[in-house]
Amino acid sequence: MDYDVFEALFEQEWGSLTEEQKRRFRAVDALYRDWNSKINVISRKDMDGIYAHHVLHSLGIALYLLNRRPEVLEKWKAGGVKVLDLGTGGGFPGIPLAILFPKVKFTLCDSIAKKITVASSVASALGLENVECVNARAESLPV
């Protein structure tokens, strides 16, 4: 699935993305392809499925909120919410969700430094000011 198919499917369910969201989602593919050529972030056999298997899958959380917990979704849209993505790996589901919900503060945490390096680099390249990446084990996080 390429970006255009992703966007069409997204808009069927949600409505239009902003131009900034489109720019960011479109950039995801190239950013992860670049990182994946250096370290194995996503299965190399699955890179062509990044939108279907990683981005849309990540946004399934938002779809669940839309269908089952609309009151929570409204809080996410309004902002002031903090979300912890524990075991984020290279940034899924946190980065796609951060693109979709720019008013939500996302903390992406993983114990593997190279994966957090990828997530941090991708978030920075996308200009996601609502993302913080932390290299730590869950039990070491302050409560």
Tell me what each language-model feature is:
Residues 1-78, 121-131:
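Class I SAM-dependent transferase core
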